[in-house]
């Protein structure tokens, strides 16, 4: 039981009521105020804002032999927990630590600070309110009572950085109560990273818009090249940014437009002060990602490559051919596993793609993983196609959305092909066209 004193809680509410009355606001029902005084308050009932299906989470916890899933956040340090608990809404301040425990059986429980005691009111369960650090420690001890193993956003040896969100000190605090902490990676994949029907529909619309913008950009690059109009990477990028606005897309960044040696840097970004001209007979890589401007929308993310001349040099064509084969191998592996209802993990997809590139003699030119999760952020928290930068052992589950984007990088150019894959119950779908070859723009007949 928390030792947060009832009379102190009541004084807080009385002060808040007085301020509200002085400002002309209404005074809440005093009985409702008293109901929030110590542990044991209702959290207000599930109103549908929380993406978690608590009974389904509890089934998963029991299947994995875990006693609970302990969500924790401080000041936005754990965006996974914040999103699951829906504390990211406008007008909400999250400057204090909160915990929310979903036990394998029984009622969820929360531990919240007195000045932000309503932040978890949308969630099912009961809460304890604390103010000082002694009350926090007592409340946490009560919250963890009887538990042996809980899942948190933690990854052993930081193997999956996207999951490793809880700081080492908080892990010590939990483990100091005799509780073993396990990774919540598989739980996050299932309950935070999988798309519902609305998310999939938003992704499709975003993808369709990105492909149209890509076509317009290729047309602009080709036309300017043929007409000998001086054009910088930044010029094309800003045209594309305007088309994003026209299409109702938002993004965390303007698109990548990278010519020749700049395409050898996978995360090159042209800016007004640093941008090269796009010359004749040069390769140009476009990487563009965006989502609809609506709550819950998920990203689409594609990469295509063109050439401003008539004939693509053999060196570039061979490299792209290997990238295309690696991409297609990864996609086919996912499709086959889905059809056969066979378990597949992120690292296996990456390894399959990289083996194609290595067998083609390009192993030394691989700089990154094969793909990443897609979500409301372009790099989502779900399973990544990665056995290169990390070892992502999480399973690909129905509802997963992710990229497949093998690339090769040399001193004078780089090539990459990026597509998006959605995993349905019975089929894996690539949500857009696949590039077959580097597109030569020197002809008036541009093939996309």
State what each model feature region is.
Residues 4-18, 22-448:
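Active-site neighborhoods and metal-handling regions in enzymes and metal-associated proteins
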